[in-house]
């Protein structure tokens, strides 16, 4: 076993009893060999390596999208003949969160490091497509594909200090407040869930990145064959335990849990989350942590007990520029209201960090 990430996770998994299922999230879909290695010693609560390889293959994903009646952007696996005017994106095949995506331009094509790209299949060239960044969340089990919902994805938002193509959050409306546009989009996306379950034998939670054009055209961009960072918002909106759904769909009986106080779902609310990135090297001191926790307690009470901040950094460190600092949540009466409340909170936290 190789040392370092991601193979160090295999060593960590080996420390658990063999009966404990292995479960993973992003971006281990890019390491199917590791997933297979872990599954040799324990049951797997998720998709095996062969499913990951197929769903991460743009050729196979294009076929699935087309058969489900959805569009897929022109995608090439070699730079030969690709226009160098920015109309195509250079995308790592083993990417996550939008990292490493760049417009394919003359200057980038002239970079001598791209000789390495031609020697191996590590990148794809995908036509830049216009549309609202969105995602579909599926819960798949044999014969029972289910669309949990659709989310608006936040990508490259300047108020999060995110790079142009970096994922930085999501907005979700529960079915109780979703309008006709959401219902039409859901109807368009249901056939894809059937293809994912039947053709690929995918199980558990699966996310699909989409672009939705103003005329309603839905373009599939990428598959994430594991629980995604947007899905916890569905739990806040009344979809039940996301982890529980995933385990059950993968064939595992849910363990009995002791009663505990937890926030009530808010089916009448829309929920939003954002990842705030560091605009510059950001020192983290204990007084800052204390102030964040104090503010979080206020917002958490406003949001019915649901945590308003997550991934709070440890003290005595410096967060590098462009690295994630903290995750922020907000609820609202509509998507627009939730998003505005989220932006207000991000601005407040940003000022606390000294990034404003």
Regions from the language model: what does each represent?
Residues 1-50, 67, 313-314, 320, ...:
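ATP-binding N-terminal substructure of ATP-dependent carboxylate-amine bond-forming enzymes
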Residues 197-232, 276-280:
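Conserved metal-phosphate-binding beta-hairpin within the catalytic cores
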Residues 103, 138-140, 210-212:
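Conserved hydrophobic "DFG−1" position in protein kinase catalytic cores
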Residues 63, 71-73, 89-90, 101-135, ...:
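Conserved ATP-binding module of the ATP-grasp superfamily
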Residues 7-19, 81-85, 113-117:
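Short amphipathic alpha-helix with an adjacent loop that forms part of the alpha/beta core around
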Residues 247-356:
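Peripheral (often C-terminal) accessory segments that flank ATP-dependent C-N-forming ligase machineries
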Residues 127-130, 134, 138-195, 224-248, ...:
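ATP-dependent carboxylate/phosphate-activation module, predominantly the ATP-grasp catalytic core
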Residues 39-108, 112:
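A conserved helix-loop-beta module that forms one wall/lid of the active-site cleft
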């Amino acid at each position: 076993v190789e040392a370092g990430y991601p193979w160090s996770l295999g060593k960590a998994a080996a420390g658990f009893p063999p009966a404990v299922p292995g479960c993973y999230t992003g971006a281990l879909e890019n390491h199917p060999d590791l997933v297979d290695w872990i599954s040799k010693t324990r049951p797997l609560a998720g998709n095996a390596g062969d499913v990951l390889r197929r769903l991460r293959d743009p050729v196979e994903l294009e076929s699935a999208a087309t058969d489900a009646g959805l569009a897929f952007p022109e995608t090439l696996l070699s730079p030969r003949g690709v226009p160098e005017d920015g109309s195509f994106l250079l995308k790592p095949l083993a990417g996550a969160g939008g990292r490493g995506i760049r417009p394919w331009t003359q200057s980038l094509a002239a970079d001598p490091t791209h000789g390495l790209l031609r020697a191996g299949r590590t990148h794809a060239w995908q036509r830049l497509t216009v549309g609202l960044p969105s995602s579909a969340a599926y819960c798949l089990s044999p014969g029972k594909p289910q669309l949990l919902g659709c989310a608006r994805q936040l990508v490259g938002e300047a108020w999060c200090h995110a790079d142009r193509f970096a994922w930085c959050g999501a907005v979700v409306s529960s079915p109780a407040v979703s309008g006709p546009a959401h219902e039409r989009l859901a109807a368009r996306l249901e056939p894809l869930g059937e293809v994912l379950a039947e053709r690929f034998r995918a199980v558990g939670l699966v996310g699909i990145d989409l672009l939705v054009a103003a005329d309603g055209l839905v373009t599939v961009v990428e598959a994430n064959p594991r629980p995604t960072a947007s899905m916890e918002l569905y739990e806040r909106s009344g979809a039940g335990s996301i982890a529980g759904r995933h385990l059950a769909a993968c064939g595992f009986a849910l363990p009995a849990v002791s009663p505990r106080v937890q926030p009530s779902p808010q089916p009448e609310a829309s929920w939003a989350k954002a990842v705030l990135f560091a605009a510059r090297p950001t020192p983290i001191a204990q007084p800052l942590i204390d102030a964040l926790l104090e503010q979080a307690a206020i917002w958490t009470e406003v949001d019915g007990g649901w945590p308003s901040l997550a991934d709070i950094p440890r003290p005595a460190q410096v967060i590098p520029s462009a690295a994630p600092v903290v995750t922020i949540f907000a609820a609202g009466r509509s998507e627009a209201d939730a998003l505005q409340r989220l932006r207000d909170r991000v601005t407040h936290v940003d000022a606390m960090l000294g990034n404003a």
